[in-house]
């Protein structure tokens, strides 16, 4: 209904190279940041959210239609996910925030500090078949302080050009260098890397954190990583794993699902292995300091309605956290491809998914982070040694030629 108004066009965001995609997102963020500042009027809802293509999808699918339907305008402030800054905004003496769009970890932290209103699942729209919202949302989506809207994930992708005898179909392929030889890109971080190691080694998603919390489980994770140590390249910038896949520097890579969507749409040689994906979500919540709680509840009900979530998922490859919304997702309105295969929460992709547990890492991560740093040092030292050996071998080949009369 509003697709013609998108600037830059959606096809640019979906298929742009990484530099172009960043520029497109920057233009969108600048446009969003130019929106009205926080208001005080009763018919204005003050809302904090993210920028980029994600923020633009919210403007089109949620903010403008809500204002048109209810007469309550949305005054948006863009933030970068910094929890301390968000708390400062919530506790500000100025115009209070009425609704916030936060990560699962931020939702948990703010809830524990008593800064959020209680979320009543009964206030949310029922599913089209009449079932209660609580039953229609995916597990863990509705909590005492907020309701999840969309999910993204870290998933393993592969380059089809590298495999002539069949492509990976299971996360176990990450450790199988005999059948799937070549370099693998993993995060330069214990988080995600250790979960992926256990998933690839056969640990069911529901047992991963229990296993990782025991000494023998941690040993198992690092033993799995040791199997592929000579074939691992570690990344610390979000664009690196996809770039390396496209440039044939690696044959498999753990990367963020949104970036993998753009890569797969723009290059048919890139496939996504959803088995063993690690997902997280964004959620809507209402600060206790809100001056407009009635409209805040109305907005969250509006924005989590199945049809609205489906419409957003047709624009951007984040998975709706409602089962009924997933069945409504169709084609991208501009590039005309079916979006459901690219959504982390699509039934065929979600079966073996693991929910990332930030709270677990905050409570248990110190020793694992130190151990991973030591493992990383081994990986990098081995890479330096191999490069030195390669250069020495090349130099040795040149010596006879130099000595010849």
Segments and roles (model prediction):
Residues 22-35:
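Bacterial N-terminal signal peptides
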Residues 346-405:
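Conserved C-terminal helix/tail region of periplasmic/extracytoplasmic solute-binding proteins
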Residues 218-227, 264-290, 332-335:
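Periplasmic-binding protein-like
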């Amino acid at each position: 209904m509003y697709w013609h108004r998108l600037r830059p066009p959606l096809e640019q965001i979906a298929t742009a190279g990484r530099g172009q995609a960043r520029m497109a997102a920057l233009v969108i963020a600048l446009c969003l940041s130019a929106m009205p500042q926080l208001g005080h009027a009763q018919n204005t809802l003050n809302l904090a959210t993210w920028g980029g293509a994600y923020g633009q999808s919210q403007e089109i699918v949620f903010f403008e239609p809500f204002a048109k339907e209810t007469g309550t305008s949305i005054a948006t402030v863009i933030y970068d996910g910094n929890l301390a800054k968000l708390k400062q905004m919530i506790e500000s003496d100025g115009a209070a925030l009425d609704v916030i769009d936060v990560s699962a970890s931020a939702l948990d932290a703010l809830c524990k500090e008593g800064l959020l209103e209680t979320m009543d699942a009964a206030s949310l729209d029922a599913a089209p078949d009449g079932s209660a919202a609580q039953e229609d949302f995916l597990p863990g989506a509705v909590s005492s302080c907020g309701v999840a809207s969309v999910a993204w994930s870290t998933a393993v992708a592969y380059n089809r050009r590298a495999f002539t005898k069949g492509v990976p179909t299971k996360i176990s392929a990450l450790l199988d260098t005999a059948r799937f030889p070549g370099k693998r890109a993993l995060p330069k971080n214990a988080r995600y890397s250790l979960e992926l190691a256990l998933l690839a080694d056969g640990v069911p998603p529901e047992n991963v954190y229990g296993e990782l919390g025991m000494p023998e489980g941690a040993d198992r994770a690092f033993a799995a990583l040791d199997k592929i140590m000579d074939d691992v390249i570690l990344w610390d910038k979000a664009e690196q794993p996809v770039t390396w896949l496209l440039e044939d520097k690696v044959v498999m890579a753990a990367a963020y699902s949104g970036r993998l969507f753009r890569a797969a749409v723009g290059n048919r040689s890139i496939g996504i292995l959803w088995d063993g994906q690690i997902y997280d979500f964004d959620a809507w919540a209402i600060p206790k300091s809100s001056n407009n709680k009635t409209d805040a509840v109305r907005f969250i009900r509006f924005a989590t309605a199945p049809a609205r979530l489906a419409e957003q998922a047709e624009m951007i490859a984040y998975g709706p956290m409602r089962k009924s919304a997933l069945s409504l997702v169709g084609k991208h309105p501009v590039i005309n491809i079916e979006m459901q295969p690219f959504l982390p929460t699509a039934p065929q992709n979600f079966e073996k998914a693991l929910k990332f547990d930030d709270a677990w890492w905050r409570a248990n991560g110190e020793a694992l982070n130190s151990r991973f740093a030591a493992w990383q040092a081994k990986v990098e030292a081995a890479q330096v040694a191999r490069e030195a050996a390669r250069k020495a071998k090349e130099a040795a080949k040149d010596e006879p030629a130099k000595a010849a009369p």
